[in-house]
């Protein structure tokens, strides 16, 4: 028996052992798998959401009692909407009631109607059972699924017992979905989403709700779990545009500390919506998300940044993921009605400004390429419809040491609407933009310029508040390190500005502590005049640009 057969046999046995533990039910497996021992009575230790507390709960406060009475009074309105769904499914009344709160005994039927699970069950009779059995026999991620199931909603009375009924149903749903949608397979967040559905829906209904949620264009959730999902790119860019517009100082700090590339606030938001805040607020946010669709993601992100503006500007690169999670969790540590009220106001404001949805995705956004690193914004934002540059190493902006006054050229181009900084990238060899390798006959440059007005007419009076630079709006443009094959516009710039005229202004010896880095070595090598003028003759020296760059 060869190594492959031995490994396959071992995996098959491991899979069977895990399945057997769930078939045996609660208290199966090793002692550490048994989980907390059940209480003799849950009467005084379980709140209205099903969360089990270690100590006896205090009596209801007047506010909590009022909220329960209000929820009961709203039940009749939800029953009326369910009874005439075709009339109310796209009405303003449905959205208004979703923000006010969905009664717990209505949430299951309403989620089922919103995700159209009954129709999926009728179209696919018996398919869930087939997918479940196939998953039991061939799942490649059953160990990860088992580990995540053991930590999902363990404080809830449904999932408190290890290998209990709800944990077994959750395992079956995840195994079936892995077999049903191989493109997504299994991701960690799916266990929390499926668990939320299991709180209010039967096992098969919860499975089809998960299928519909990830397949629906309205919710755009599959892009967060699929390696080829194109929705994340558009949502991420739109999020950065919206937050940068409303909170420029916050996003400027995140760019400066390189936190946007380290942990995505939008990705963190999805994680927080699933596991990280109180269950009551989680359910209410999911109610709004299922009704509104992906439009709700931008307002939620905007509120989180707005509430935590001062604390986020103090975030450093030390543990950025943990710090982001803590800040977002603190955002929601307040009254649920207050959060939903601010969310509704933010939704109306963004809808009015057409900032609740990203622009239509471009074809290349559906690829599996990594997410680009955003360029420095300064105090301005990108023009509408623009996209960030391809990913590259994080930029460092050293202070140039000037040895001579660079020549000035007339400014004769038209800026972006609103004075925003535009960044355009072109594929190598694109028509109208010559390839650097073909034009130069030598190594490609290692720097790319953010297009300020028109790249071929870019002036040489580099304006960084120095004694020779009077066009101060140029300080929003900066040098950004990028993949060398993306330096498409260098030949156009060099054609009108010979390198000898510019090198004289940047000829001071380097004192930068990073001159021994691979980037500096590569740039110096490419600056050798072996194949004609080279844009890399622009040496950026010292440590920092003047304040305000």
UniProtKB/Swiss-Prot annotation:
UniProt keyword DNA-binding, yes or no: no
Region Disordered: start-end pairs: 350-419
Cellular location(s): Cell membrane
Residue ranges, compositional bias (Low complexity): 398-417
Modification note: Ubiquitinated by a CUL7-based E3 ligase, which leads to proteasomal degradation. Palmitoylation is required for membrane localization and protects TBC1D3 from ubiquitination.
Domain Rab-GAP TBC: from-to ranges: 101-293
Annotated tissue distribution: Expressed in pancreas, thymus and testis.
Short name of one Pfam family: RabGAP-TBC
Record membrane topology: Lipid-anchor
Gene Ontology terms, MF aspect: GTPase activator activity
Residues where lipid is bound covalently (S-palmitoyl cysteine): 318, 325
Keywords (A to Z) from UniProt: Cell membrane, GTPase activation, Lipoprotein, Membrane, Palmitate, Ubl conjugation
Top-rank taxon, per record: Eukaryota
Its biological purpose: Acts as a GTPase activating protein for RAB5. Does not act on RAB4 or RAB11.
Name of the protein in question: TBC1 domain family member 3E
UniProt source species: Homo sapiens
Organism taxonomic ancestry: Eukaryota, Metazoa, Chordata, Craniata, Vertebrata
Gene name for this UniProt entry: TBC1D3E
């Amino acid at each position: 028996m060869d190594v492959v057969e031995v490994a396959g046999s071992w995996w098959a046995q491991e899979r069977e052992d895990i399945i057997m533990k769930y078939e045996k039910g609660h208290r199966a497996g090793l002692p550490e798998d048994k989980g907390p021992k059940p209480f003799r009575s849950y009467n005084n230790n379980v709140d209205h959401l099903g969360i089990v507390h270690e100590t006896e709960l205090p009596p209801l406060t007047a506010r909590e009692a009022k909220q329960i009475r209000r929820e009961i009074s709203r039940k009749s309105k939800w029953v009326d909407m369910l009874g005439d769904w075709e009339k109310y499914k796209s009405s303003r009344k449905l959205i208004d009631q979703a923000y006010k709160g969905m009664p717990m005994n209505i949430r299951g039927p309403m989620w089922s109607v919103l995700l159209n699970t009954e129709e999926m069950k009728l179209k696919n009779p018996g398919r869930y059972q087939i997918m479940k059995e196939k998953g039991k026999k061939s799942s490649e991620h059953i160990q990860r699924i088992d580990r995540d199931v053991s930590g999902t909603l363990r404080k809830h009375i449904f999932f408190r017992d290890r290998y209990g009924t709800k944990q077994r149903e959750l395992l079956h749903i995840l195994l079936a979905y892995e077999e049903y949608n191989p493109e997504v397979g299994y991701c960690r967040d799916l266990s929390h989403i499926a668990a939320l559905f299991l709180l209010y829906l039967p096992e098969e209904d919860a499975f089809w709700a998960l299928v519909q949620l990830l397949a629906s264009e309205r919710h755009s959730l599959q892009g967060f779990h699929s390696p080829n999902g194109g929705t994340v790119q558009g949502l991420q860019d739109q999020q950065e545009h919206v937050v940068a517009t409303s909170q420029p100082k916050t996003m400027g700090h995140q760019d400066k500390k390189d936190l946007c590339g380290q942990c995505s606030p939008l990705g963190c938001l999805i994680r927080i919506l699933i596991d990280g805040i109180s269950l009551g607020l989680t359910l209410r946010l999911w109610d709004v998300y299922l009704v509104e669709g992906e439009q709700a993601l931008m307002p939620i992100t905007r509120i989180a940044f707005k509430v935590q503006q001062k604390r986020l500007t103090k975030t450093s690169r030390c543990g950025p993921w943990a710090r982001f999670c803590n800040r977002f969790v603190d955002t929601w540590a307040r009254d649920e009605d207050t959060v939903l009220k601010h969310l509704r106001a933010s939704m109306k404001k963004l809808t009015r400004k057409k900032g609740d949805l990203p622009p239509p995705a471009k074809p290349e956004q559906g690829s599996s390429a990594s997410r680009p690193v955003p360029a420095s914004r300064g105090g301005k934002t990108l023009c509408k419809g623009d996209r960030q540059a391809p990913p590259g190493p994080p930029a460092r902006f050293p202070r140039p040491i000037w040895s001579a006054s660079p020549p000035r050229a007339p400014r004769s181009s038209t800026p972006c609407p609103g004075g925003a900084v535009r960044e355009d990238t072109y594929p190598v060899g694109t028509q109208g933009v010559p390839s650097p390798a073909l034009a130069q006959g030598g190594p490609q440059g290692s720097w790319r310029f953010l297009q300020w007005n028109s790249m071929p007419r870019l002036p040489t009076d580099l304006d960084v508040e120095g004694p020779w630079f009077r066009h101060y709006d140029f300080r929003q443009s900066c040098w950004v390190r990028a993949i060398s094959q993306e330096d498409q516009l260098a030949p156009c710039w060099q054609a009108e500005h010979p390198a000898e005229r510019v090198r004289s202004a940047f000829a001071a010896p380097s004192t930068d502590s990073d001159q021994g880095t691979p980037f500096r070595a590569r740039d110096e090598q490419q600056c050798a005049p072996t194949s004609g003028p080279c844009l890399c003759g622009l040496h950026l020296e010292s440590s920092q640009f003047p304040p305000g760059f």
